[in-house]
Amino acid sequence: MKFFIDTANFEEIKEAHAWGILSGVTTNPSLVAKEENVSFHDRLREIAELVDGSVSGEVIALDAEGMIKEGLELAAIAPNITVKLPMTPAGLEACRFFANKGIKTNVTLIFSANQALMAARAGATYVSPFIGRLDDIGQNGVELIETIADMFTIHNIDTQIIAASVRHPQHVTAAALAGAHISTTPFKVLKQLFHHPLTEKGIEGFLADWNKRKGE
């Protein structure tokens, strides 16, 4: 499973990129709205120049014509921009348009296997099931990942599954085991993946032994 980072904060992206683990970035209107003094297109351009992999930029229009117009503008920013579309009839209409043009798409706000299958058949490059939000309403988000992965395998579907709405490190592990191709993970959760008390205790022990030896 690959790691994407789910943020529009350029400093967070730069730090995670330096770790050598990032394969892409996802953004959405809510994340971009938190960033000040930079336009949406300029921020996507900055990210796309730094990160070689897919950079998802989401449309805001609700009609297919508007989505297509916005998506073409986003795709023109850089060759690694992926147009992010909502799971609606208009979103799938736009998805098919972009698929026919060879433009990558990420269909977001997936909450059922049927939605994922429809998006895949509309030509989506990626589908993004929201596991945390499903957990919030008492459903099993990771189980949905597994169902979609099984369905795609049975029917030889190439669309990749992005585990989204990732809340904690356990979501990352579970998504990987369930068959997600990618986890798009907030910066806070990515940093949490580093930590284990035995790792930190081991580092402290090595340093203590080394400093003791130096003092002899």
Curated annotation (Swiss-Prot):
NCBIfam families: fsa_talC_mipB (TIGR00875). The keyword Cytoplasm applies. It catalyses: D-sedoheptulose 7-phosphate + D-glyceraldehyde 3-phosphate = D-erythrose 4-phosphate + beta-D-fructose 6-phosphate. The keyword Cytoplasm applies. Keywords: Cytoplasm, Pentose shunt, Schiff base, Transferase. This is Probable transaldolase. PROSITE patterns: TRANSALDOLASE_1, TRANSALDOLASE_2. GO terms for cellular component: cytoplasm. The gene is tal. Its EC number is 2.2.1.2. It comes from Lysinibacillus sphaericus (strain C3-41).
